[in-house]
Amino acid sequence: VDLLSQDGGGFGCAHLDASFATSDGPGGLRTAIERLCDEAEAHARAGIGLLVLDDGGVSDTRVPVPALLAVGAVHHRLVAAGLRMETSLIVSADEARDVHYIACMLGYGADAISPGLALETVAHEADENPDSEMGGPEAQQRLQSAMEDGVLKVMSKMGISTVDSYRGAQIFEVIGLGAEVVDVCFAGTPSVVGGIGWTELGEDCLARHEQYRLGDGGYYRALKKAGSEYHTHNDPVVKALNELQAAHFLQAAIRNGSDEAYDRFSNLVNSRPPTELHDLLELVPAGPPLPLEEVEPARAITRRFSTGAMSHGALSREAHETLAEGMNLIGGMSNCGEGGESRRRFITRGQPKGDKNSRIKQIASGRFGVTPEYCAYADELNIKMAQGSKPGEGGQIPGAKVSEEIAKLRHTQPGIGLISPPPHHDIYSIEDLAQLIYDLKQVNGLADVSVKLVAEDNVGTIAAGVAKALAEVIHISGANGGTGASPLMSIKHAGLPWELGVAETQRALMENGLRDRVRVRMDGGLLTGRDVLMAALLGADEYSFGTAAMIAEGCIMARACHKDTCPTGVATQRPHLRAKFTGTPEGVAAYMLFIAEELRKGLAALGLRTLDEAIGRVECLRQRNMDDPRANTMDLTPLITLPSDPEAARHFVKPVEIQRPRSSLGDRLLADTYRHIWDGGDVELTYKIANSDRTVGAALGGALALEFGDRPPPGTACVRFEGSAGQSFAAFITHGIEFELVGEANDYVGKAMAGGRIVIRPPDNDAGDPVLMGNTCLYGATGGDVFIAGSVGERFGV
C-alpha cells in the first residue's frame, strides 16, 4: 500500500478508521458504519484509488468495527453511487484469521486483505518456539499459502476460476441477521428468517472489547478467553459430558429395551437450549388428543425411516452390514453410500433374518462401485447431487482406509486416497439429470429413483425440476447431514438448516401441482421422535438418520472417522479395531422403534391418527416466545405460512404413469435375446436405431446382472445396429453382450458398463475423419472392450 500510494505510483491512498468510541455505546457501531461509507464515497469522488479499512486505531477506548460489516457496507455504498470501479478496497483487520472470514470479505467486495494479527502470531510462535524448524518469515509464508489454498477450494466449490469473478459475487446466505443489517452490508443476500440488528451487534462488539482488558482472570467463573484459569466444569467439558450422557442413555435403552432409558435420552435432547430452527417452534393440537391405540402402528412408521448415505469404507464392514440388517428388520431402508457393496450381501436380499442388502444404492459423482449388478439389487437408486454439510464438494476417503477389500469394491488400488469430483460429469443441466434418471429406470425398472439436494435458497425451484424429471423421491439434506465425512470449514460454514430446505421444497411442489406424485425425504441431525414430527409438519414424508444410527450401533463420538482409528470399530478398516465392534442389528432396530413410538405419542397429542395426516400441517406449528430476546428476533413465519391453496395435496399420494418410462427398442432387445442367453444360446440380431432410441442395452444388462452377477452368462448376444443412436447407448451392459453400431452415437456411450463389447464404426461410404460419439462416454465403466473407428467428444473415459 505504501509503495502504491507514493507520488510516482499514480494512486492516492486514504486510511479509514474502522473503530468507534466505547462511550458511544452499542449505537456507535451503526454510526461508525455510516461514517465509513460517507468517507469512502467522498474519497472516491476525490479520485483516491486506494481505500484502506483499518482497525489499527483500536485502544482501551476504541472498539473495532467488524471488518466484514465494514467492507460490505462500503462496497454497497460505492456500487450505489456508481463509484466502485474508481477505487480499490483493502482491509487491514486483526480479526481476519481463517479461510471463511477471508472468503466472506472477498465475496463482499474486498480487493485485498491484510490479516496482520494472524501473521504476527505465527511469526512469534515460530521465533519463540525452540523446537520450531522454521523462522517467522517462513511461517508467515505458509499461513498465506494455506489461506490462499482455502480460498481456492471455496471458489472451486462454486465453480469459479478467478478471484475477479468471485470478488463481490455474494455467494452466501444469511442466518440470524435482521433486514436492517442485511440491507446495508449484504444487500441482495437471502436472509429468510431474520435475526438480530445493529443494537445486538454493537453489544457484542463492546463485550468482545471488554475481554481485551486485564482484570478478570476467570478465578471465580469459567471464561473462554485464552489465558484464563482452567475450570474443571467449564462449558466445553459440560457440553461434552452431556453428549456422552446422551449417547449412554441411548445405548442403555437399546441394550435393555428400556422405555425409561430412552425417555431420559429424548428429554435430554428435547430440552436442550435452542440449537436448531425447529427448537424455536412449538406444537399446536389439530384436535382433541386421541388414545394411542388409534394411531398407526410403529412398524408402519418405520417404513419411512432410512439411514444416511455412509459407505462401506467410511464405515467398517461390520458397522455397515449392521445398519443394513437393522433397518431391514423394521421395513426401513439403509443407504449404502458411495463405494459399492459386496455381492455376498446382495444374495441375502429378502431373507427374514440376515438380510444385509442395502435397499438404497447411491449413485455419486465418482461412480465408485456402480455396476449393473449393484443397480439391479436396489429398491431405490439415489443420485447424490450434493451433501448437506459440504455442498459443492465430492466425497473422499483417505488412502489409509482404502484396504484391499475397499479397493476391490471401488475398482481401484489399495492405499490410494479417493476423491469424487464436485459435479457429475454427465449432469450439466436439468435435462442431463432427467437422462440419468431415465438410464437408471432402464437398468432396474422396479427401483425408485431419488435425488439428493442440499437445503439452500431457491432449492424449491430445483426440486420442482427434479419432480418433472420423473424422480420418485426428493431428498433434502440439511447442514448437519454428513458431518462425519466433511472438513471442519464446511461443517462450520456451509449448508443451511433442513427446516428451510424442506419448507421451501414443500411450498414449491404444492404451487406447481407436483406434491402428490413425489415423496420428500430429509436428513440433518434427527435424534428423537419430536424431531421427526417437526419434519413431518413442515412437509417431509420420509426421514433419514446418520449420526444417531451410528450411536445406536456403538459410536461414542470419538471424532476420529477420518483417522482410521475409531476405538469402537465403527469407522475404521483396521482389523484389530474392527474386532472391538459390539453393535447389533437389533440395537439399530430398537432405536428406530423407540423413535416411532415417541412419534406416535406426539401424533396422538395433536389429535392425528397417521403421519399422512401430519405431513405439511404447518398450522400445527407456531413460533415459541423464548426467554432469550435474541432468539425472538428471528421470524419463522416463512416456514409455517399456510399454502395459497389449502386444498392442494400436502403429501405423497401416488406416482404418475409417466414416472416409469421405457425404451421401446431396449425392451424389444431384452425380449428378443434374454431367454436365448439364459438357455446358453448365441443369438445374432440386427436393428435400425434412431437418436430417439435412448439407453438401449441397459435393460438387458440389468436383467443379466440380476441373474448372473459379474459372471459371464451361458449364452451371448451379438447385435448389429444401423443408424444414429440416442444417448446412453450400451450403458450398463455386461458380459455376454456385443454391440456393433454402424453409424454414430450421442453422449454417454458405455456408461457404467461392466463387461461385453462395443464396436462403433462409420458406414462404408463415409468421407473419413468421423466423430462417432458424443461427450462423457465410458463414464464409470469398469469392464469390457470398446473399439471406436473415429473421434469422440469431451470427458472421455472418466
Question: Where in this protein do the model-derived segments appear?
Answer:
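Flexible, glycine-rich loop/tail regions that form catalytic "lids" or insertion modules at the edges
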Residues: V1-T31, E39-H43, G47-L50, Y101-I102, ...
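Active-site cores of enzymes that catalyze phosphoryl transfer or operate on phosphate-rich substrates
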Residues: V1-T31, R35-R45, C375-I430, Q435, ...
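Gly-rich Lys/Arg/Thr-decorated short loops/hinges at beta-loop-alpha junctions or inter-strand turns
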Residues: G8-G28, L53-S59, R84, T302-T307, ...
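Alpha-helix-loop-beta-strand connector modules within alpha/beta enzyme cores
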Residues: V63-L89, R142-D149, K153, L436-V443, ...
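Flexible glycine/proline-rich, aromatic-decorated loop/lid segments
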Residues: V71-R77, H100-M134, Q141, N357, ...
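Catalytic cores of alpha/beta
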Residues: A96-G109, D457-A469, L527-A540
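Mobile "lid/hinge" segments at catalytic clefts and subdomain interfaces of large enzymes
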Residues: G109, A118-E120, M147, V151, ...
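Long, distal/terminal scaffolding or interaction modules
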Residues: L577, A589, L603-L606, I615, ...
